Each structure stands twice: as C-alpha cells, then as structure tokens.
Regions:
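Pyridoxal 5′-phosphate
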Residues: 1-374
Length: 374
C-alpha cells in the first residue's frame, strides 16, 4: 500500500469536488452569454466567488479568477508595476519561482534578506522601504513556504509595509491548505493562491485585490484583469472546496509531522530539520540527509515502496539548478534535502511504516556511497 507525502506539489480531488464535476459535465455554457445556458455557468462562477471570499474574509467583488497560482503572482506584480509610475518590487528570495522571475523583469526590483530559517529580516525590509520612499513599492512575500515550511510574520510585515505607504502582496498557495487566511485581519493588499492545493481542479487560481489597489490587466480583451472565457468547472471545483475547508482547518495540526520525524529519529543518525522549527506549516517536514542525493531518495521510495515525496518544489524538480530557497537560507547540503508534505489525515501506522522505509533507503544509499569511495 503506497503513501502520498507530496501534498505541497498537488492534492487529490476531494470526493465532493468529484461529485460536482460529474454533476456539471454538461454545464458547457459561456458565463458571458446572455441566455439560460450561459446563466447556469455564471451562477457557478458567482457561487464560487462568494465561497472563496468567505474563506478569506472579504467580498466577492475583490476576487479575480486566474488560470493558477503563477498567473495570480504575475498579474499582481506585473499589473502593479504597469499601473504605477516609479514602481519598485521588493521580493523574498524564498518565494515561488514565478515571483522571482517576474520581479527580476520589472523596471526596479530587489531581493530581501532572510535568516537561516527563511524568515524575512524585518529590520532590513524597513531600511529598504525608508531608502526607497520616492518609489511606489510593492513588497512580495509568501505566507508559508511550500518547500521548507517556514511561516512569515505577516502581521508585522504588513504593519511595516503600510507605515511607509507601500503595498503588500502575499503568495498563499503553500499555506492556504493548512493555515486559515484572513486578509482583513492581516491587512493584506493582494493575495494569491491555486485551486489544486485545496483538493480542486488544476488550471484555476485566485487573486484577491483590495478595491483601491492599482492594477493593470495581465491579459487584454475585455474589462477584466484576466480576460478570456472562464474555466467554469475549475472555478466551481474551487468553490466547493472553499466551502469545505473551514472544517478541515479545525482538524489539521502538526501531530502527524511530529510522528514521522520522531520515528525517523529512532532509526537514523545524522539528519536534521530544514527551515524553522517554531514557525512552520503543520504538515511540512523538510529534512536533510547529508551524504545522500535527494533525487535518489525520492526515486527509490517511489519505485520500491510506492511512497511519493519531493526533492524540493515541484516546479524545480526537473531543473538541474539548486533550489533558490535553499540557496537563500545558505543551506550547506542543498542536494540532500527531501520534503515530505503530509495531508494531516495519515494513520499513525502508515507513518511508522514510512519512516522504516525512508531510513532503509537512506542507510542503503550511505552504505553504497561508502563502498564506492573506498
């Protein structure tokens, strides 16, 4: 029996989402059409906007549907830069690659400094904001890093950002499956996330935007910020999961992560936690096995034991370059880090069995390495 421990890459469809898809396969209408078939599709879009808005404590008018998390990131950053003269982007180096790459392409941008766990050094952020007071600045951070699990102090960052009349965009794709998001309480100007991290369909994302935040469209063709015929089933599937997730938040905690880590400690020496132990997503376990190639660990666990995990962010798994996040925190063994991202609903015996198999693979690879260096 396999065990899927790669939920930070994507999640299986919720049963309720599957039911919604099956029941709406014939809802083929264009939501912009002015007839009853189009109206049915429009009803699904409106329903989903309300449910997503309720999930993050805002109004449906502030919800923009996109094609995914990367599209939301790009719309927020590029749209802000085009809408504001003398704009500058300050971004966290631990953010998703889509954020880093689009930020570098803006007229003026700068990477923020982080500590060894990946948390923003707020005093450095404040200095940069003070030095760049003449710019219209957008600060871009992730709430919870999907690779190393570190959670940022968004309340403090927001307070500092707005003290200098700057704007704050928060990428919540990695955190929203595990941590409730209240955009009003945190005083966030814009936030984005992806549907497929919440048990919904791929190809759908969300951008929350306060009504007074300046933004230019990413795709032109209508009066919308993200023009094109909307993905009705994808957006509808997100509406279903958004309605269910408040109950999930009540059940998700760090218990299963602690079980897996403690079981590894019983069986392995010379490994350590990557990221913050105190400020961490409850279902993220990124560990470093020095002397072992993380890609080999991932491949053997999958092929031999049907256990799925990751050697970092899924977006970087087919790249030969090292993880920008691990480089940003100055991880000394970046090619030996393995991410286990749990759902929070695994059974204890499944995790104990997984720990045995993980330890066996790591010990086997270390033994092989020793024999080949003699």
């Amino acid at each position: 029996m396999g065990l899927y421990l790669d939920n930070a890459s994507t999640t299986p469809l919720l049963p309720e989402v599957k039911d919604f898809i099956i029941n709406n396969l014939d809802t083929f209408g264009n939501p912009n059409s002015s007839h009853k078939i189009g109206d049915r599709a429009k009803d699904i879009i409106d329903y989903s906007a309300e449910k997503v808005a309720n999930l993050i404590n805002t109004n449906a008018e502030n919800i923009i549907f996109t094609s995914g998390g990367s599209a939301s990131n790009t719309l927020a950053i590029k749209g802000f830069s085009e809408a504001m003269q003398h704009s500058k982007i300050l971004y966290s180096p631990t953010c998703h690659k889509s954020i880093i790459e689009v930020s570098k392409r803006m007229f003026v941008s700068k990477s923020l400094n982080v500590d060894g766990t990946g948390r923003i050094i707020v005093s450095d952020l404040e200095r940069l904001l003070e030095d760049n007071i003449l710019y219209n600045t957008l600060v871009v951070v992730d709430l919870g890093n999907s690779e190393i699990g570190t959670v940022q102090n968004i309340s403090l960052i927001s307070e500092v950002v707005h003290r200098y009349n700057a704007y704050l965009y928060v990428d919540c794709t990695g955190s929203i499956p595990y941590i409730p998001l209240d955009v009003q309480k945190l005083n966030i100007d814009m936030a984005g996330f992806s549907a497929h991290k919440l048990g919904a369909l791929k190809g759908c994302g969300v951008l929350f935007k306060k009504s007074d935040v300046p933004l230019s469209p990413l795709i032109y063709g209508s009066d919308d910020y993200f023009s094109g015929t909307q993905n009705v089933l994808g957006i509808g599937s997100l509406g279903v999961s958004a309605e269910l997730y408040p109950n999930f938040y009540k059940k998700i905690n760090s218990k299963n992560r602690s079980i897996l880590y403690s079981e590894l400690e019983k069986r392995l020496n010379n490994f350590y936690l990557v990221g913050s132990s105190e400020y961490r997503l409850p279902c993220n376990l990124n560990v470093c096995f020095p002397g072992v190639d993380s890609g080999n660990v991932v491949s053997i666990l999958d092929d031999k034991y049907d256990i799925q995990c990751s050697a970092g962010s899924a977006c970087n798994n087919y790249s030969s370059s090292l993880s920008p996040t691990l480089l940003a925190i100055k991880e000394k063994n970046p090619s030996s880090c393995v991410r286990f991202s749990l759902s929070g609903f695994e059974k204890k015996m499944e995790l104990i069995d997984a720990a045995k198999k993980i330890a066996s693979v790591v010990e086997g690879l270390r033994y092989w390495a020793e024999q080949n260096t003699m």
